[in-house]
């Protein structure tokens, strides 16, 4: 992820981040809803967002935070739209903090307190296996040594 100040951050990089983090989510959810509506109008859509959608402005990550904030707003709007129309499609969002992956930790140094990808997978499983009459909309998780606020 590119980080930079607003004065020097190139517009084309900002657009690339928005395409990757917002437009792609919109396209996937749009198609998922079409498929679910044609197959009984029920199901669960779980989106992976970021803790950056909630605790924004941590220095030079404005474009990334803005994209994740947009995803949060979009998911909330879609959830309200579906619920308001009487649909049985539930929409949820997981907002993780730092996860130990090759993207966040390219040197593969041992980060004992960072979340593992399996933590996120377990969270998805928790959301999708909730009873049909329960929708877990927002699940924010982060490592104990992460200071998001």
Residue ranges and their predicted role:
Residues 55-56, 77-89:
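Active-site-adjacent segment of SDR/Rossmann-fold oxidoreductases
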Residues 4-6, 10-15:
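Substrate-binding pocket helix/loop in short-chain dehydrogenase/reductase
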Residues 9, 56-65, 77, 107:
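Active-site loop-to-helix junction immediately N-terminal to the catalytic Tyr of the SDR YXXXK motif
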């Amino acid at each position: 992820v590119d980080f930079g100040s607003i004065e020097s951050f190139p517009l084309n990089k900002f657009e690339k981040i928005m395409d990757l983090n917002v437009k792609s989510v919109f396209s996937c959810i749009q198609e998922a809803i079409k498929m679910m509506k044609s197959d009984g109008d029920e199901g669960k859509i779980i989106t992976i967002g970021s803790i950056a959608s909630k605790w924004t402005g941590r220095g030079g990550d404005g474009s990334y935070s803005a994209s994740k904030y947009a995803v949060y707003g979009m998911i909330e709007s879609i959830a309200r739209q579906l619920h308001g129309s009487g649909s049985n499609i539930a929409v949820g969002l997981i907002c993780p903090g730092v996860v130990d992956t090759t993207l966040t930790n390219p040197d593969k140094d041992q980060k004992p307190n960072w979340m593992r990808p399996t933590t996120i997978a377990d969270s998805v499983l928790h959301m999708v296996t909730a009873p049909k009459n329960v929708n877990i909309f927002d699940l924010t998780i982060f490592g104990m040594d992460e200071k998001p606020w």
